[in-house]
Amino acid sequence: MDRIRIVGGNELNGIIPISGAKNAALPLMIASLLTSDTLTLENVPHLADVELLMRILGNHGVDVAVNGRRERQEDSYSRTIHFTCRTIVDTTASYELVSKMRASFWVIGPLLAREGHCRVSLPGGCAIGTRPVDLFIEGLTALGATMEIDAGYINAKAPNGGLIGARYTFPKVSVGATHVVMMAATLARGTTVIGNAAREPEVVDLANCLNAMGAKISGAGTATITIEGVTSLSGARHRVLPDRIETGTYAMAVAMAGGDVVLENTDVALLDTALETLRRAGADISATNNGMRVKRNGAGIKPVDIVTDPFPGFPTDLQAQFMALMTRSSGISHVTETIFENRFMHVQELARLGARITLSGQTAKIEGVQRLRGAPVMATDLRASVSLVIAGLAAEGETTVSRVYHLDRGFERLEEKLTRCGAVVERISE
C-alpha cells in the first residue's frame, strides 16, 4: 500500500495548475445517461473516483473514449473524455461498485428519467456520518416516482408516461440531491421547481451543461431552480469548471509552509469566503489573469474562527485543511462543523504531530503551537488525508501518511504539484 513521505520546513514557491473539479466532473459524467448522443467533457481530472465512475457508467451501456494518454506537460493535467450511451443496457447499479463511492448513487436520477425504472444500491464512499438518502427519495417521489427499499437496494419506478414536474422544497440543503432531482426533472412532463436548492458552483456547472444539451433550466446558483421538462436531450461539449477545493487546499498549504505560489486555471470567485478567511489568517491573496497568487512571507499565522456552511459559506471540504493551518497559529481558534456530524476524524492524527485540539460536540478548539514534529499518521478520509500533508509541510522532520488511496480519490498528482514548488514530498510504493 502506498504512503506519502513529507520532509517539513520548506517554503512553496512556483506555479501550481489547478485541475478540473472532481465534484463537478462526477455529476457531469452521470448526465451522459440522459442522452443517446455523445457528451464530451473537457478538463476532467485523472482521479480514482473518476476511473471508478467510468467503470460504473460502462456497466449501464456508456461507451467511454479518452483522448490519448495523459500528457506529462507542465500545464496538462486533465483530459477530454467522450461519453456515449446509445442504449442503456442495465438499469441496476450493483452494491459491488456503488458501495465504493457515494456519488455513483446519483445514476438513480438519469436512469429513472430515461428508462422509467431502476434498481440502485444504497451508497458508500467517505465514512463521514450517516449521509442519508432520504432527500433523494423524497425529491424523486415528488416527481411521481415510487421508491421501495429492499435488501440494500432502492427499486424506483416512474409513473406511466414518465416523471411529472412538481414543486418540491428540500428540508435541508443537499448538493447531491439537488443534482439528482435536477437531472431527473429535465425529462419530466411539465415544470419542476426546486426550493432550498444547493447554490454551489458545481450545481451551476451541471445546469450549464444540461442546458447545452437542450434542457431548460433557470435559477441555478440561487435557492430556487426551475426546470421545464423536454422530451429528449442531445449531445454537447462542456468544460469542467476548476476545482475550488483543490484551489483552497493549495492556498492553505502556502499559508502553512510560507512562500509565494501562483495557482493557475482557477477563479477567486469560486471561493470568496474561504479566501477572505485565509487573508484574515495572514495570507496575501490577489487575483491574476488566470487564477490567483498566494503569499505568506515572514508574517505569522493568526487565529481565525470558522463555521462550515453550504455555499457561499465556508466549505466543509476545506475544514480539515484549515484546522491543520490553525495548529500553527499564534493563539486559540475554533472550527465548528455544521454539515456533517462526524468530520473530525483527522483530529487524533494531527495530535500525533503535536497539535493541541479539544473537541466539544461539533466544535474543535485549536491552541496554536510553535512547532509540529513529524510522525507516522494515517488518512481517514479524502479531505482529512490532505490536511495531514499540509501539517507535514510545516512539521519538523519526516511525516509519513498511510492509506493515501483516499488522496488519490480527490487530488490529481498532489505530490508532483507540491514537489515542483520546492516541497520534499514523495510517494513510497510497497
UniProtKB/Swiss-Prot annotation:
Annotated Pfam families: EPSP_synthase (PF00275)
Signal peptide extent: none
The EC number(s) this enzyme carries: 2.5.1.7
Enzyme class (EC, first level): transferase
Highest taxon of source: Bacteria
Pathway linked to the protein: Cell wall biogenesis; peptidoglycan biosynthesis
Gene Ontology biological-process entries: cell division; cell wall organization; peptidoglycan biosynthetic process; regulation of cell shape; UDP-N-acetylgalactosamine biosynthetic process
One GO MF term attached to the UniProt entry: UDP-N-acetylglucosamine 1-carboxyvinyltransferase activity
Main location (coarse class): cytoplasm
Binding locations of phosphoenolpyruvate: 22-23
Catalytic reaction list: phosphoenolpyruvate + UDP-N-acetyl-alpha-D-glucosamine = UDP-N-acetyl-3-O-(1-carboxyvinyl)-alpha-D-glucosamine + phosphate
Keywords recorded for this protein, A-Z: Cell cycle, Cell division, Cell shape, Cell wall biogenesis/degradation, Cytoplasm, Peptidoglycan synthesis, Pyruvate, Transferase
Gene Ontology CC annotations of this record: cytoplasm
InterPro entries, A to Z: Enolpyruvate_Tfrase_dom (IPR001986), Enolpyruvate_Tfrase_sf (IPR036968), MurA_subfamily (IPR050068), RNA3'P_cycl/enolpyr_Trfase_a/b (IPR013792), UDP_GlcNAc_COvinyl_MurA (IPR005750)
Location within or outside the cell: Cytoplasm
Binding site for UDP-N-acetyl-alpha-D-glucosamine: 102, 131-135, 172-175, 317, 339
List of catalytic residues: 126
Residues modified to 2-(S-cysteinyl)pyruvic acid O-phosphothioketal: 126
Family listed: Belongs to the EPSP synthase family. MurA subfamily.
Function: Cell wall formation. Adds enolpyruvyl to UDP-N-acetylglucosamine.
Protein name (Swiss-Prot/TrEMBL): UDP-N-acetylglucosamine 1-carboxyvinyltransferase
Organism lineage string: Bacteria, Pseudomonadati, Pseudomonadota, Alphaproteobacteria, Hyphomicrobiales
Gene name for this UniProt entry: murA
